[in-house]
């Protein structure tokens, strides 16, 4: 499935990003500032754990009755004059949207931020038929004009770029001549994008939450770009993962409140856009034609399994914003559009273990992600389940790990081998030990001892010590 954003071995990507001092500083700053803002709005709301439990109940109930609510949504969209397409795969979703673009003879398409269109790799499909696709979220716009640089964060896709880098991109691609002042950069982008809104044939959006009872879709933004993407083009296409649905507006209000506080530390974002089908007669704006593409792309295979809780995700990135591993390696190290703890759980499920078998190990299992999640996804537990599957079912554990575990099993199962090993260990590790500590370990211990020390094996075994004590001796 077309989710990969980076090629090359996982550890090579990690090493490269560990050497990126700006990226690491930007991520650390984002996490620290976000923590303070989030804590403030959570305390102001009050009863946060009760809110989390309510949000969890809403998501669980919806997933347990997903077929009913998807059918209700589909019927209500159709009643409003919209078209609904259920896409089992990324290819089916892309082909449907491609056909709509060809039918409308579209030359220009404007898009608001959408993770699922990144997931299915939609843009190249439309560009291949001659459409100019313009991302209108400022972060996504910056990445697009910078030769399609992939996003590194679910909410802040251009987090890995500083203002000087963005200025250079604007100078190179847009003829920008002013300073690196963020206000000037944003003003220039706004002027460029305004022309695209007015001349676009099709608008494409993602979906934060679809409302089953009304056939509406909601979009949560701080830039207002979704308003223009849905209001100006004659044809509107919304692409949503099949799990991004709630029964009524009441549930949507709860989840939006949790989303905005968890994602950006705000009570509400600047804009919440609600779109319900094509424009009615007499309306002055809105699309003449509306299409809703509901994407499966592996999600149905997660339903009913031990990993079903991951589909509760509302894409707030709260788990990413507290993750100590993400803090050091950034988003591109994950090799998937979904980074951080949620990406480490979701990417192997949607993209397979062959490409993402390392991600469940990119975690300290500190459970900060689970505590931060506003819908109570047990992320650290799901990471452990992935590790178990990788070893037991998939057989994809590293060769060194397999050999080490086999040797450990044989040694602990045989008393004679165990005694021999405990006698040999002090001599074997002596060249690497100093004052009873191993500071530069061999083999698998090398990476471990780069950031911590390892206790050297004792010269006197516990069994020998105990026997001496039993005989009334003076154990050392």
UniProtKB/Swiss-Prot annotation:
Region (Disordered): 440-476
Residues involved in [4Fe-4S] cluster 1 binding: 313, 316, 319, 373
UniProt feature, compositional bias: Polar residues: 467-476
GO biological process assignments: lactate metabolic process
Biased composition regions of type Basic and acidic residues, renumbered to the chain: 449-466
Superkingdom per UniProt: Bacteria
Record keywords: 4Fe-4S, Electron transport, Iron, Iron-sulfur, Metal-binding, Repeat, Transport
Chain coiled-coil ranges: none
Keyword Aminoacyl-tRNA synthetase: no
GO molecular function, a single term: metal ion binding
Residues binding [4Fe-4S] cluster 2, per UniProt: 323, 366, 369
InterPro entries cross-referenced by the UniProt entry: 4Fe4S_Fe-S-bd, 4Fe4S_Fe_S_CS, FTHF_cligase-like_sf, Helical_ferredxn, LUD_dom, LutB, LutB/LldF, LutB_C
Annotated ranges, domain 4Fe-4S ferredoxin-type: 304-334, 353-382
Record keyword Cell membrane present: no
UniProt similarity note: Belongs to the LutB/YkgF family.
Function: Is involved in L-lactate degradation and allows cells to grow with lactate as the sole carbon source. Has probably a role as an electron transporter during oxidation of L-lactate.
Protein's name according to its UniProt entry: Lactate utilization protein B
Organism this protein belongs to: Geobacillus kaustophilus (strain HTA426)
Organism phylogeny: Bacteria, Bacillati, Bacillota, Bacilli, Bacillales
The encoding gene: lutB
